[in-house]
Each structure stands twice: as C-alpha cells, then as structure tokens.
A protein has these predicted regions:
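Carbohydrate transferase catalytic cores enriched for Leloir-type hexosyltransferases
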Residues: 1-417
C-alpha cells in the first residue's frame, strides 16, 4: 500500500457537522448492466442510504430523476441487483432515460445532440437544489450545477489509450475530465495510481483529490468445493483446475497476449487447465474474438459472455487463478473480488492493482508474453496456491459502508469549500 499518500482520513472535519448532508448522485450508470461504474454507483448509493450516512439522496438520470426506491429493492443475498436495465425497476423516468441513451449510442452526432439536450435539462431541473444539495458525478461527466460538486475519475484510459474507445466516448470523457481538472470540483479517485497521474501529468492540486479504494461485493468469500459443484458440473469444470479471465473483451484488457501465453503453455504441456473467459464484447474486439474462437474450437477455452453475479462469484471461488494482466486499470475490481473469494491472482506490475493485491499475487510485465506465460506455468505447480489465497487482508475485509463513509468525508470537505 502507498502509505506516503493522504487518504480521506487526513481531511480535517468539524466534530459535529451542523448541516444535513444532501446529495444528488448521477444515476446514469444504473441504466445499463451493473458492471464497472454501474456497480460502483449502485453499491455506493445503496450503502449511503442503508447506513443513513446521507440525509437525502436523489438520483439524476440525465433527463429526469430516477426512482431511488430501486436501491432498497435489491437483495444482497440474491443473484445481484439488475439496476434499471431491468424493466421492473425503471419506472417511467428510467424507461425514458434508457430509450434516450439508446438513441445517443447510434452515432457521434446523436451523442452530441443527446448531451446538449440532457445538459439543458439538468441545468433547469438541478438549479433549485444548488443551495441544499451537493452533486456527485460517478462517471466522468459533470452537468451544470451551481452548488458544491464532487466527481469520481475512475481512470484516464480515454486519454491514455484513446484508440481503445469510440470517438463519442473519448470526447465525452475527455471533456468531463478536463472540466473537472480546470474547475473547482473535488475529485475522487479509486486508486493512488490515478491520483498520481492527475497530480504529476495534469497539474491538479493534491488537496483537491481524495483516494477512496473500492470494496469487494459483500457476497465475496471462499467457498467449499461442494458448494460450487453444481455450477462447475454444468460447465464441465474441475474445482481449482482452470484459469479465469474476467472483464470486457477489449484491447485494454490485454487478452491477445493472454491467449498467446495460454496457448504456448498448453502446447508445451506446462498445464492442462482450460481458460474460462467471462465478459461482454467491447469495441474493436474482433481480433480477440478470433483468437478466442480458435481456442474454443481446439477445446482449450470456454466463453461465457455476461454471467449472473452468483455464477461469477462461484467461478472466482473455484478458479485456479484469475488472469488479469491489463494494460491499464483505474483500480481493477476483478482482482480484488477474486482475492476476496480465495482465488490466486496474476496481474500487472506497477499498476493500481499493486495497492491492494495480497502477498501471494503473481505480478507480470503485461507487455511481455513470456512473463505472462511463466506465471501461468507457475500456478498449477506451486502447492501454496492449491488451497487459494489467504483472504484475511485489509482490502478483502473492506466493505461498501467503509467506501460510503470515506466518500461522505469528501462530501463534507467539498461543502466546506
């Protein structure tokens, strides 16, 4: 852990805040499947409400306010929250927002029209709340708001690797990031890695940035083989005898090198484990799918696309190792959740993941196929990995209430100006 950095615990706050804490949270990420930023938004909002950290929480969905009651309908013991992608959770406002965003995704110009309309709508609807509420944007884009503002910048991938993103996404995220950097917005980052990028490369004052590490899904835990057997049998898998890859199928996830390293290891008979790939198809992923299809055709891999939370947690707890040597991450939640489930992790050196990874983590050079291959070879042959990771680490024990509490500290600091 980077102990030389300050956390939200270092922010000086009044002992007894006199003002109520009222927050408008950007709810747009809740309109799709709850992966990445959608998951962050849901878990943060749910923890803020459930623990009564905020006095009032409103969800703004670009064109109108969303039904915050959907946060209370999720059952943390079930397969997981569906968000507003599930029609039964949407309500009229959510359905309108989903339809509008579908239109915006059609082209760059449709996206620009959508941003103009939603920006005007936000300015009009949010104006009355400027004196009573703080606005927190969880996804790079900050609407016009005259009150206190907080923005979470999860990563700088659209700036670091613009070639990996659609043009409209690059324009939107770059605009949001630069607006936050140039304005008087307090910034939250998921890692010190991104915080350092903002300070060193973009000249953002460190006093304006707070790092709040994420937490694993509250259902993450090691599971006995008997508990996983039904799901594993359905997939034809053996307990602790397969590699797992989790994340969107896109160039930034470095899957081409993973597939190359995996095939080389199988060809050399270093291991006989299959590779299980979980993740929705992303942009510019045709080559990744071609290589994956070749592995599947040869009986070496299985592609599961998007799976339920319950299935994913079972896979984490059952895998011999998570293979996650991403080229760039703002945090790397799959690595944390896998470790919290007792799964060994192979991930990138000098990355955000190094801030929370357990001692047994195997770090690799993500740009070196042989480095990845050596790590794949090491896992099945090392007995200490047979029973999984020791998950008794600070990061694995962290909860979303911890995240919400530290985030509320940032809110109060932002309100103090």
């Amino acid at each position: 852990m980077h102990t030389e950095h300050k956390t939200t615990a270092d922010v000086i706050l009044p002992e007894s805040p006199a003002c109520p804490l009222n927050v408008v949270l950007g709810g747009t990420p809740l309109l799709g499947r709850l992966t990445g930023i959608g998951r962050y938004t849901y878990e943060l909002a749910r923890a803020l409400v459930a623990s009564q950290i905020v006095d009032d929480l409103k969800l703004w969905g670009d064109l109108s306010f969303l039904d915050a009651g959907m946060l209370k309908r999720g059952d943390p013991t079930s397969e997981g929250p569906a968000g507003l992608a599930d029609k039964k959770n949407r309500g009229r406002s959510g359905s309108l927002a989903v339809s509008a965003r579908a239109f915006a995704s059609r082209s760059y110009y449709a996206s620009m029209v959508y941003q103009f309309v939603s920006g005007a709508m936000a300015e009009r609807r949010l104006r009355p709340l400027a004196d009573s509420h703080l606005y927190h944007s969880p996804n790079f884009i900050m609407p016009h708001f005259d009150g206190a503002r907080v923005i979470t910048i999860h990563d700088l991938s659209t700036i670091r690797f613009p070639q990996f993103h659609r043009k409209q996404m690059v324009v939107l995220c770059e605009g949001g990031i630069h607006s936050a950097i140039e304005g008087k917005v307090h910034v939250i980052t998921d890692s010190f890695h991104v915080r350092d990028e903002l300070v060193k490369d973009f000249g953002v004052e460190g006093s304006r940035i707070s790092t709040v590490h994420l937490a694993p899904d509250p259902r993450c835990r090691p599971r006995h083989e008997s508990e996983c057997r039904h799901a594993l049998d359905a997939l034809g898998l053996s307990h602790k005898a397969f590699f797992l890859s989790v994340g969107t199928i896109e160039p930034r996830k470095n899957l081409l090198r993973v597939f190359e390293a995996f095939r080389a290891g199988r060809r050399a008979s270093h291991f006989d484990w299959p590779l299980i790939v979980v993740g929705a198809s992303g942009w510019k992923s045709s080559r990744e799918h071609e290589m994956l299809d070749e592995l599947i055709k040869d009986g070496l891999a299985l592609y599961l696309d998007y799976v339920t939370d319950d299935t994913l947690l079972t896979l984490y707890a059952s895998a011999g190792a998570l293979v996650f040597p991403s080229l760039y991450e703002g945090f790397g939640l799959p690595a944390l959740e896998a470790a919290a489930c007792g799964c060994p992790v192979i991930t990138s050196e000098h990355s955000a993941m190094a801030e929370f990874a357990p001692e047994q983590t195997l770090f690799v050079n993500p740009e070196d196929v042989s480095s990845i291959s050596d790590a794949l070879k090491a896992i099945p042959s090392r007995s200490e990995f047979g029973s999984g990771f020791d998950v008794s680490t600070q990061a694995a024990a962290r909860t979303w209430v911890d995240v919400a509490q530290e985030t509320s500290d940032v809110y109060r600091a932002a309100l103090q100006g």
